[in-house]
Regions:
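Fe(II)/2-oxoglutarate oxygenase catalytic core
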Residues: 1-157
Length: 157
């Protein structure tokens, strides 16, 4: 693990998968959750043949999109990701916030367009994806036994 402005942990060598710690604060995450929750809609995927967005049984989640110009904190997150990855964020997509909830899932898939998906990102004007950045946020549950009758659950971040 490297120590710097952000902690870097190499999780896998090939393909290279890196975990960066402390890029988003708890305050950043709370702001993202507050802004995205009222916007959540059933997630869609792009049909590679038609280019249309549609729901799919292999992706069960709710999704919202946040623009960097909506809040200086979102803009700062983009800046930090650019700093860590050394990638230009000008052609990146909006910040996608997904909630998989109970029973939600996304089956294995590609985040880049394959050869047969010639116009996958045409409407965005961004070109193909070269990297995917994920902030993984989950609630942890602590169960405390109460009089041998059941369990008590506390939400802890």
């Amino acid at each position: 693990m490297k120590i710097g402005p952000y902690k870097e942990e190499e999780a896998f060598l090939s393909p290279r998968i890196v975990i960066f710690h402390d890029v988003a604060s708890e305050g950043d995450i709370e702001m993202i959750k507050t802004r995205s929750t009222p916007r959540f809609k059933r997630a869609t995927v792009q049909n590679y043949k038609t280019g249309d967005l549609e729901t799919a049984t292999y992706r069960i989640s709710k999704t919202a999109w946040l623009k960097p110009e909506e809040d200086i904190r979102i803009s700062n997150i983009y800046r930090r990701v650019a700093s860590v990855t050394r990638l230009n964020m000008e052609t990146s997509e909006e910040l996608q916030v997904s909630n998989y909830g109970i029973g939600g899932h996304y089956e294995p898939h590609f985040d880049f367009a394959r050869r047969e998906e010639k116009n996958a990102f045409a409407s965005l004007g961004t070109g193909n994806r070269i990297a995917t950045w994920l902030f993984y946020v989950s609630r942890r549950f602590i169960y405390s036994k109460i009089d041998s009758q059941g369990f008590f659950r506390k939400n802890v971040l």
